[in-house]
From Swiss-Prot:
<dbReference type="GO" id="GO:0005737">
    <property type="term" value="C:cytoplasm"/>
</dbReference>
<dbReference type="GO" id="GO:0034010">
    <property type="term" value="F:sulfolactate sulfo-lyase activity"/>
</dbReference>
<protein>
    <recommendedName>
        <fullName>(2R)-sulfolactate sulfo-lyase subunit alpha</fullName>
        <ecNumber>4.4.1.24</ecNumber>
    </recommendedName>
</protein>
<comment type="subunit">
    <text>(2R)-sulfolactate sulfo-lyase is composed of a SuyA and a SuyB subunit.</text>
</comment>
<keyword id="KW-0963">Cytoplasm</keyword>
<keyword id="KW-0456">Lyase</keyword>
<comment type="function">
    <text>Together with SuyB, desulfonates sulfolactate to pyruvate and sulfite.</text>
</comment>
Amino acid sequence: MLCVVTSDNSDFRLTAKADIPIGHKVALKALKAGDTVIKYHEDIGKMVGDAEVGGHVHTHNCKTKRW
């Protein structure tokens, strides 16, 4: 997939490791349990499991502050 960094309009390519449903997140870097999850420059939660680059990030491995 083509990823665009909105703050500086740069871009890069990333391969998703699986089909990622709409509304779910894709790990842009390797994430380990305990890491902070950032979305649109905001801290939205903590990882409770690992995700590799291109991995699926959702409730199975991320505990959001929202819930």
